[in-house]
């Protein structure tokens, strides 16, 4: 169980977690943060989003139900890249890759990512995501 959990501080570490999903086949996200740009600037919207949509990675995202996120959802094809909405927001994200999960804190004073590579916990988180996905609005 060595290195099953890592705490990675800072915006660069958070970006590296998102970039890691590009190496896999599938990724699920619960992105309820509305203030992420305070920590990572426009990187997600202007850099990562293009890489993700241009990759072969199949994605599902549950995002906060905001006008901006509804506009973001319109960019998705609904097959390879799907989106659903929750009315709540929180300043953290959950990222599920093929073989890892990450909880991301967008606390501007101390942003960080907790990366978990213990496959039993990752499998459990994938079950949790299925429940969230099933309950989220289209």
Task: Label the model's feature ranges.
Residues 1-7, 11, 26, 37-138:
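PLD/PLD-like phosphodiesterase catalytic module centered on the HKD motif
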Residues 9-19:
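A short, well-structured juxtamembrane/interface segment
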